Amino acid sequence: NELGVRTAFIASADQGHAHDPNGPYGYDETSKAFDEYVLDAVKSNNLGKLLELTQDFIERAKPDSFWQMLILHGVLKKTKLRNTLNVYECPTYFGMLVATYE
């Protein structure tokens, strides 16, 4: 960075929360579609794609991650960081994604 200081930014949030009809938010197929869209955005290093999602789509998917990923998108626009997708799992009613940017 401009100051020559190492900096860390951590965006922590779960993906869609409507993967399981027995979960607290019920089931909506949009959760799976949202998670797949986010996975593609991370894999292609193009979080700007998230700006194309509609409010209805986001609300139906019930993610915690949307705003944090937009902030990360802003950070990535100002840096030359590239990502590594570490893991995506959906072990319960919500999806989880871990990516490292260096």
Predicted regions mapped to residue ranges:
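Active-site beta-strand/loop microenvironment that shapes enzyme catalytic pockets
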Residues: N1-F34
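Flexible, D/E/H-enriched segments
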Residues: P21-E102
